[in-house]
Amino acid sequence: MKGKEEREREGGGGAVGPGAAGPGAGGGSPEKSHSAQEHKEQGNRLFGGRKYPEAAAAYGRAINRNPLVAVYYTNRALCYLKMQQHDKALADCKRALELDGQSVKAHFFLGQCQMEMENYDEAIANLQRAYNLAKEQRLNFGDDIPSALRIAKKKRWNSIEEKRINQENELHSYLTRLIMAEKERELAECRKAQQEENVDESRGRVQLAGIEAKHDKYLADMDELFSQVDEKRKKRDIPDYLCGKISFELMREPCITPSGITYDRKDIEEHLQRVGHFDPVTRSPLTQDQLIPNLAMKEVIDAFISENGWVEDY
């Protein structure tokens, strides 16, 4: 069985492999195409040895020989991804998509680049596109694309939550300053009135203490309110084990396969009808009548939904 890196380089489960030039390959002479293919195969060998800079250079030579083959760009993009050179990988993915808009690898690697560059909306869109194309083309990438999509969605959620936290902290600081400023203003006015009215010292202390207590309560109530918001936010996380392996969303009707993998029923049934009769993670043979409702998981999911009303917006 091929390892993940080899499947990525070749295109995974039936995608364009080392021996295929891919769409748009007819732009050069037979001699040039043959030479480009040799460079590509050299790049594959170097990539297999984890020599990513050398592999990228070999794919670059293939591109120089024949710049019309999308897979050369996606192979080099994967090298750049391994070297964390995301700008270069991004450019190669976009060029590959210009040559072949249906390239699963190009969308997959582009989504990974955008995720690393914290462009989460674009990353999710491209990873979802890669997943949909893989289903349409009946290519099996195992859990590679679904896993990347789950990570991108979680990172986007965390980014949104971080912004919310910063906004709440700024609001808390602003309101604290307002309350403190109002307290100082009232204290100053009270002291001035006490002097003008010649209020005795004991009565004056009581008046000032009342102002202090009032604003201290404002601060305490505000802190309690923000604390409640913070406590609710800490619970805004859907555990991975409650998410489907295909849709990456909270499961609604979990069912388990003979391999022990739990899926959302509508997603696994769609997979069996559109892609093939096998478990998408383990690749073991699977038919619809082998799906068994996971009642224990359903009970856990229902309890989670009832306790977390925000879950629909996750």
Curated annotation (Swiss-Prot):
Name of the featured protein = E3 ubiquitin-protein ligase CHIP
Q: Where is this region: Disordered?
A: 1-47
Q: SMART domains given for it?
A: TPR (SM00028), Ubox (SM00504)
The protein's matches in PANTHER family, at most eight in alphabetical order, are given as: E3 UBIQUITIN-PROTEIN LIGASE CHIP (PTHR46803:SF2)
Q: Which cysteines are joined by disulfide bonds?
A: none
| Role | E3 ubiquitin-protein ligase which targets misfolded chaperone substrates towards proteasomal degradation. Collaborates with ATXN3 in the degradation of misfolded chaperone substrates: ATXN3 restricting the length of ubiquitin chain attached to STUB1/CHIP substrates and preventing further chain extension.
* Organism the protein comes from: Gallus gallus (Chicken)
Instruction: Give me the stretches of Basic and acidic residues compositional bias.
Output: 1-11, 31-43
Q: How does it assemble?
A: Homodimer.
Q: What class of enzyme is it?
A: transferase
One annotated GO molecular function:
ubiquitin-protein transferase activity
